[in-house]
Amino acid sequence: MTHRGGRVAYRKRWLKEFRDWGIVAVIVFGLMTLFNIYVLNVSTVVGQSMQPTLYQGEKLIVNRIALSFGPPKRGDVVVLHDPSTGPDRKEYLVKRVVGLPGDIVEVKDHKLYVNGVQAEEPYIDTEIQDPDFAAVTVEQGNYFVMGDNRHAGASKDSRYFGTVSKKMIIGKAAYIWWPFSKFNAL
């Protein structure tokens, strides 16, 4: 009888430990899900619109809480919901903030101007090859975003779908983490 009682006690201990590990796994999964939704998440670059800064397939760490501590700044690389419509609509876009609320943004002679001053853009490799874009004033709470790829037709951005509200921006792209050889802060 003691042998049978020992097996029963062992089985109860094993089941209790299995249950405890299951509870820990559910809690860890829940915390990681919340962390991914509200703090940091991983995004994959799709397309060429941010070349030469970002290339197809690179993985980014997106800081989702950065915008809770302050608005996007000029030059920030952000991930946003695609505001466009149509068959080429994507879930998310990666773009650079070039115009802040109240700014006047235009493309003149294939160069970007913000508030009448030619923007310094060390991250681009060519002048803008798309047609010039008439001056637009960025509304309060909105941002003018562009892709770094200035070759003709290479970026679907605020020149095509207009300014984007802060609510459309889900986070700031903080790092390139893959491929690891390109690990870098943005």
Label each region the model flagged.
Residues 129-157, 161-171, 176-178:
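Soluble extracytoplasmic domains of inner/organellar membrane proteins
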